[in-house]
Amino acid sequence: HTRGFSASRDELISNDLPSMDAATGEKYVGNSDDSWATRSGFFRVNYSFADRYLLEVNGRYDLSSKFPKDDRSVFSPSFSLGWKLSEESWFKQATNGFFDELKIRASYGSLANQALDNGWYAYLSNYGTGTLGYIMGGKQPQYVLPGGLVSNTVTWEKVTQWDLGLDFVILQNRLKGTFDYYQRKTTDMLGPGRILPNILGMSEPLENAADMVTRGWELALTWNDQLDNGLHYSVGFNLSDTRAEITKYDNPTKSLSSPYYEGQIVGDIWGYESSLFQSADEIASAPDQSKLDGGISKVPGDIRFMDIDGNGVVDYGENTVDKPGDMKIIGNNKARYRYGFNISADWKGFDLGIFFQGVGKRDLMLPYTFKWQYGSMWQVPTAVGNDYWREDNAGGWLPVARFNGSQALGQNQTRYLLDASYLRLKSLSFGYTLPVSLTKQWGIQKCRVYFTGENLLTFKHTPEGFDPELDDPYKYPQQKSLALGLNVVF
């Protein structure tokens, strides 16, 4: 339950008198009073027999005022099973003690989500009120607007997942590993429903509009060892991948204007094959692409779109999956093959830690900031803005400089589809701990000097100014940092 109150007044007489009575302009007063509630119950049961057979059962029941009365409840059960094969005598004999530990796991469960992006009561339509910006009868008239469309059957979004896993330890506890394969089904996804005709004059209501299936796997390996000279070291590696597919959505024509269609791989980028015109002869023999570039009078260096279907016109057809014209899937913006590896070591007081992380595959259409003609001069990194086509730079990345080329440049296309995979030295640390026999003479229990660094190296394919680790290109890139430190314990 939240309550809010606000009051303000224009035309303050003096900044030194921050009082509403010290102003002469209009007064504005507002308040808010919002509330919502949940009611929940849950249970958990754990069972272990001989530290060999493991069982856990969970369940919870939830009610939420965010949904209509008949759709407020949801029950979310889950269970997990584990079997330590390495504790079985017959398995030890069969493997001749090769496995120090081996466990197989299985789990199944569901969760529910009530997070709504458009307010606390998505099934209720609200009126909008305000003051018009013109004068009638000596004063500004008030107005009341009808609310948008709502669904009276909106309810919980549900996620159900099953998982199969394997944990193992071998080679005298030096090599440890885990592997998981999972499938997650999201049903009754909260989002906009089927696209409605523009003549309606309102946007689509929030509905339980779609189902999605996500499949993925995760692998992690760690090696620990100590050499005869006292050097202890550890090396770790992890790798994972996931893909999501829309399995239900009310879009019978599979329109590409809709947010989803059945069979869609989440993150797919539809676009055109493109290059740059290099001569007037290429322009004269090119198919009609006026639907994509606005019919501008083209010159060498302008964007050239490919006529994939060979009909002499470059366009988007009926803008559907089955009739996309010259469009096709040119990439996918979801990160795949996320990986990381770390190294740590210590020897005679010295310690070292290194951590790398990266993404093996990801495609990206950069936003307008990185396309010179589509943004202002203040938005574009110099290295990018200067690399445009001209006679002495026919290999320039951006097209020829012009004031009316934004429509062509704004199309999703292969020329400006970037490889957003990367490898980054995320952190590095190196330190030395002075011998205790020395520090005790100074009344110090421990003394360590160290150096640390973050984001020191990045191997990437994207233009300068864009950080491939960030999902939002407009966020400020992560900064490199260096530090020297001293830890003293008395």
What annotation goes with each model-predicted range?
Residues 25, 309-312, 395, 406, ...:
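Intrinsic-disorder/low-complexity loop/linker signature
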Residues 1-271, 408, 412-490:
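Extracellular/periplasmic, surface-exposed regions of secreted and cell-surface proteins
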Residues 332-365:
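Glycine-rich, aromatic-lined ligand/substrate-binding cores of catalytic
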Residues 64, 305, 359-448:
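Extracytoplasmic gating/loop element in the C-terminal half of outer-membrane beta-barrel translocons
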Residues 62, 163, 167, 180, ...:
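Acidic side chains
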